[in-house]
Amino acid sequence: MANEMEFEKPILELKSKIADLKEYNETSDVDLTNEIEKLEKRLAKLESSIYSNMTAWDKFQVARHPERPTTLDYISLLFEDFMELHGDRAFGDDAAIVGGIATFHGIPVTVIGHQRGKDTKDNLHRNFGMPHPEGFRKALRLMKQADKFGRPIICFIDTKGAYPGRAAEERGQSEAIARNLYEMSDMKVPIISIVIGEGGSGGALALGVGNQIFMLENAVFSVISPEGAAAILWKDASQAKKAAESMRITAGDLFELGITDGIIPEVKGGAHRDLNAQAEEINKTITKSLHALMAFSEEQLIEQRYEKFKKIGVYDTL
């Protein structure tokens, strides 16, 4: 089957066998109902075993799945009256980042996120979700607007990283990312960041200075891809599996390290299996987080955000 992952092969083989038996059962005089029921029970156990024991590399594959829901998929289900806003008012628009104003259960909010493409043409248009400086500056423009009008900011993170091309560097890629980090740290409104797929390095951090940061269960967050790390450490990109295990990139790892504030459960097999169910899980998390943060004063929001990031990386205190 297309877009299925290596670790799912035993599941797919058993599903195929069950499908063949069901087809044969409908056209023959032999009753295979009992055999089919046994295989379906075996399939349920196999799925439970495989999906509950996924390695970091397995989760990385799920995070990169071509059918994984994108920012716009979630926006259409989670928010009302979304109006997309374009451009950074300096150079141009960047389709790798989408953003605009909307309402969330009646609360006016600003929503921003990385946007991958759905097919080859769309991916080329959106640069595979890797923003140029104008994308980060567009995001910052929308954040400043939200800060001015008192709208909470909700960010969806899903990028391999900021685009490393020459033109992007010439237009100030590193400055654009650094500026976002600087400005976000002093915003007077609640900021919620959710890693829905890949959280790649500075490209992810530019939308990640939140009062609360969450990750979907199979999302990843790292300074470099496993392939890139393997190429540097072992001069061999084929060692990506080994690198993924060493880098501590999973939602569980990041929560344990105190970098994120929670893990959003995923539907069995990954978010791409059931978009509506996955959106509902995200809805619960945003609702709870937003109501908690909206009780803070402006000064408390800034202080809480500052203290949160100051504690990251602390091993011990005297």
UniProtKB/Swiss-Prot annotation:
Its EC number is 2.1.3.15. It comes from the Bacteria. Pathway: Lipid metabolism; malonyl-CoA biosynthesis; malonyl-CoA from acetyl-CoA: step 1/1. Residues 38-292 form the CoA carboxyltransferase C-terminal domain. This is Acetyl-coenzyme A carboxylase carboxyl transferase subunit alpha. GO terms for molecular function: acetyl-CoA carboxylase activity; ATP binding; carboxyl- or carbamoyltransferase activity. It is found in: Cytoplasm. The keyword Lipid biosynthesis applies. The keyword Oxidoreductase does not apply. It comes from Listeria monocytogenes serotype 4b (strain CLIP80459). The gene is accA.
